[in-house]
A protein has these predicted regions:
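A structural signal for multi-pass alpha-helical bundles of membrane permease subunits
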Residues: 1-207
């Protein structure tokens, strides 16, 4: 709490980092400039929430699909090892992920450009140099790294569903779609909400 309150306190002053002892009070002037005079801030806010919404939506969908697959194969011998390999992107630091995809998306030497050129005949361009391709790239990279996190949460949720509900659904003749929509998804909504909150906090840090 103290760092947050101290940051709010400092925001009410005009100062240089090298001369903090000479700061002078300006009140809400910094906020006034930020909200009403800065053209970049609203765009940054819009882009941040657009990227967050898109990334989290993709992560929930893909995470649930992956969680469902691992839930169905949980009794197979090597399922735990496969799950461990799947969650490895979470362990990578943002710097490492950024450098890897910087090379992958390089328009001259990147493998992505090579595939687009040789397979689809699309001429390489600066994927991170144009607004729309850059946003799509960030969403894709963000989703790639954090979908396993959502998968682990939703898999934990699926593990909490009582076997009695599956047995009752089987007796009633419910198909896989009814089981998924009437039993599994309602049972893991709290896990989805937890994942959304945690990921939203992480995505806002992109700002």
């Amino acid at each position: 709490i103290f760092p947050f309150l101290y940051s709010v306190y400092l925001s009410l002053f005009q100062a240089k980092l090298t001369k903090m002892h000479k700061k002078f009070f300006i009140g809400w002037e910094n906020y006034q400039v930020l909200l009403f005079e800065d053209d970049v801030f609203p765009t940054a806010i819009k882009n941040t929430f657009m990227i967050a919404f898109s990334s989290i939506t993709i992560e929930i969908i893909l995470g649930f699909i992956m969680a469902k697959i691992f839930f169905e194969i949980r009794h197979i011998k090597f399922s735990n090892a496969l799950r461990t390999v799947t969650i490895m992107p979470i362990m990578l630091t943002p710097l490492c992920v950024g450098l890897v995809f910087l090379y992958i998306l390089n328009p001259t030497l990147g493998i992505f450009s090579y595939i687009l050129d040789t397979v689809f005949g699309i001429e390489p361009f600066a994927y991170l140099g144009e607004p729309l391709p850059a946003k799509i790239s960030i969403i894709a990279i963000n989703s790639w790294q954090w979908t396993p996190f959502m998968m682990i949460l939703l898999l934990a949720g699926l593990m909490t569903v009582p076997n009695e509900q599956y047995e009752a659904a089987k007796i009633d003749g419910a198909n896989w779609f009814h089981v998924m929509t009437k039993i599994e998804i309602p049972s893991i909504l709290s896990f989805v909400l937890l994942g959304v909150v945690l990921r939203l906090i992480e995505c806002i840090r992109l700002f």
